[in-house]
A protein has these predicted regions:
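N-terminal FAD cofactor-binding segment of flavoenzymes
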Residues: 54-96
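Glycine-rich FAD pyrophosphate-binding loop
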Residues: 29-57
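C-terminal helical "tail/cap" subdomain of flavin- and related membrane-associated enzymes
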Residues: 330-412
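Central beta-strand plus flanking loop segment that forms part of the substrate or channel wall
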Residues: 67, 180-215, 245-249
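Short FAD-binding loop at a beta-strand-to-alpha-helix junction that anchors the flavin cofactor
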Residues: 294-312
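Conserved FAD/dinucleotide-binding core of flavoprotein oxidoreductases
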Residues: 221-285
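Beta1/beta-strand and adjacent pyrophosphate-binding region of the FAD-binding site
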Residues: 4-20, 40
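Conserved N-terminal helical subregion
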Residues: 84-186, 194-199
């Protein structure tokens, strides 16, 4: 429920009420309902006033793996989201201008879908409504945590909304406020960063032909190009595009008029879904790898982009964050049963030990994929050809790759 001012003390304070922070709060509240944990979510932006029935051609979207769907189902979020999600029934992986195409289908995997694409506004409204209605979660917005200082068995927090400040004690502070978390900087938590010298051009398009639940990962000379299926909008065959290009080319492409940019995109993607009939407003953001050197401290844990920001090439950022979130909920749940404070290091250390292999594999896989498919050197071109061919020739290898893509194979 929305509160006008926070109480003096909470078991858990979550900085950030976005997709990761809100989902964590809802999942934790459901899993530990009997424990009666006091949870506070602090969100800098006011709840959206967007009409839930209003549609937009340009709505941003997120790809959720099959494993993420299961996590959201356990949190009773999926029951509200399922009728707004577009299923991915087939993934087509190709290298522009070279032989070798790999296809992964839900039929091969005996599943109804490999994953789902949801519009951020739909998921955001569901999460916001759940936070607003929840009796076990205090939702303080718009507000920010201005200062965080360790104390014995917890944290002292200074939370501001407008000209008012509130002092709050918390056993555990969860930082889920994005890759530019000011509290991380204030606490001196350092991030290792790697610049890929690429920008992502993100937009929605309408194709001549229906996508039929197909998602495409196309590796081009400009960089990886992902095309994801979206729900139709006014009888338009919509897809979401994430096109990774080098920094210099991104400036060039964004200066083009819409017709010229559409031609460039059509040339890179080809005619798999016919011609592109409409191009939405493009947005651009820099791509890199960022990993926090400390994900836990006594009474502090990092989740989502504040812990690790990945390249979108494999679509694993949000999915990894949800698996981290699920593991943290389980560790806190076990700790409480053992009589531990939820911010104790043994609780947080157990979480990190359980998730470290998953994180390492996803980060390494994504980083290697970027380097392999963003290079036109002959050795890497041959490696790509062999890789795509091997996925088709060896069913066991394809099944293993599919499990990773569906978010059910990481971490052993």
């Amino acid at each position: 429920m929305i509160v006008k001012s926070p109480e003096n003390s909470y078991d858990i304070v979550i900085a950030g009420g976005g997709m990761v922070g809100a989902t964590f709060a809802i999942s934790l509240s459901k899993a530990l309902k009997k424990a009666g944990l006091k949870i506070l979510v602090v969100e800098a932006f006011e709840p959206s006033t967007v009409d839930p029935n209003a549609a937009s051609f340009d709505s941003r979207s997120t790809a959720l793996s099959f494993g993420s769907k299961e996590i959201l189902n356990d949190s009773s979020i999926w029951v509200e989201l399922s009728n707004k999600a577009e299923p991915i029934r087939e993934i087509v992986i190709s290298d522009k201008g070279r032989f070798g195409t790999a296809r992964i289908t839900c039929k091969e995997q005996n599943l109804e879908a490999l994953g789902y694409v949801v519009e951020n506004k739909d998921l955001g409204l569901i999460l916001n409504n759940r936070l607003t209605r929840s009796e076990s979660i205090h939702y303080f917005t718009p507000a920010t945590i201005r200062d965080a200082a360790p104390r014995k068995s917890g944290m002292n927090l200074k939370i501001s909304n407008g000209s008012d400040s509130h002092l709050v004690r918390s056993n555990l502070l969860v930082l889920a406020d994005g890759g530019k978390s000011p509290i991380c900087d204030q606490l001196g938590i350092v991030r290792a960063r790697q610049n890929y010298n690429q920008h992502a051009i993100v937009c929605n398009v309408a194709f001549e032909k229906a996508h039929r639940g197909m998602a495409f990962e196309r590796f081009t000379e400009t960089g990886p190009l992902a095309v994801l299926p979206l729900r139709n909008f006014k009888n338009e065959n919509r897809c979401s595009v994430v096109w990774s290009v080098n920094e210099q080319e991104s400036d060039k492409f964004l200066k083009l008029n819409q017709e010229a940019l559409l031609r460039e995109l059509q040339g890179q993607f080809g005619q798999r879904l016919g011609r592109i009939k409409k191009l939405g407003e493009p947005h651009c953001f820099p791509l890199g790898l960022s990993i926090a050197k400390e994900q836990i401290r006594p009474s502090i844990v990092l989740l989502g982009n504040v812990a690790h920001t990945l390249h979108p090439v494999a679509g694993q950022g949000m999915n990894l964050a949800l698996r981290d979130m699920e593991a943290l909920v389980k560790s806190i749940e076990k700790g409480i049963k053992e009589g531990s404070n939820c911010g104790e290091m043994r609780v947080l250390q157990r979480y990190l030990e359980n998730q470290s292999a998953d994180q390492h594999q996803v980060i390494t896989f994504t980083d290697n994929l970027v380097k392999l498919f963003s290079s036109n050197s002959m050795s890497k071109v041959m490696t790509r050809k062999l890789g795509l061919l091997s996925l088709e020739l060896f069913p066991g290898l394809k099944k293993s790759f599919a499990k990773q893509a569906m978010g059910i194979g990481w971490g052993g």
